[in-house]
Design a protein with these regions (language model features):
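Conserved "HGTGT" condensation-loop signature of ketosynthase/thiolase-family condensing enzymes
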Residues: 1-136
Length: 136
């Protein structure tokens, strides 16, 4: 089996958007789940969620999203993103920076990047609505 070296990490989570914040929350046993303002309607049985600070992806138009300036994404690229893809993109940028990798090193075929996500509930909901409208 080939050796794998982890040289950089990045986080965008409900317990922090950088290594130090995430580590602090974990060491202090602090969770990232709380009352979500958009869920505080009588019709919804769900009232809590993991809120990611410094990001506002409430608009259906990705070009209206608010996120840290250091992660600026080209307009033609962000138009294809769902919120979880933006979080993954920002985490990858952190990991590349943390590893001190140059562009040519990231482009090297021997370099690999890995990300994980639970997916986008907004996308799941949107597709279920379409299925419902079509009687599927």
């Amino acid at each position: 089996m080939p050796k794998v070296y982890v040289t950089g990490i990045g986080f965008v989570t409900s317990i922090g958007n950088d290594c130090e914040s995430v580590e602090s929350h974990l060491r202090n046993l602090e969770g990232g789940i709380g009352l979500h303002p958009e869920l505080q309607v009588d019709a919804s049985p769900v009232k809590v969620a993991g809120i990611i600070e410094d990001f506002d992806v409430s608009s259906v138009d990705p070009e209206d999203w608010i996120y840290p300036e250091r992660y600026r994404v080209r307009r033609d690229v962000i138009r294809s993103f769902s919120p979880h893809v933006l979080y993954a993109y920002c985490s990858m940028k952190q990991a590349i920076e943390d590893a001190n990798l140059r562009d040519e090193e990231v482009s090297d075929p021997d370099c690999g990047l890995y990300t994980a996500s639970g997916g986008s509930m907004r996308s799941v909901h949107k597709h279920f609505e379409k299925m419902d409208q079509r009687g599927i």
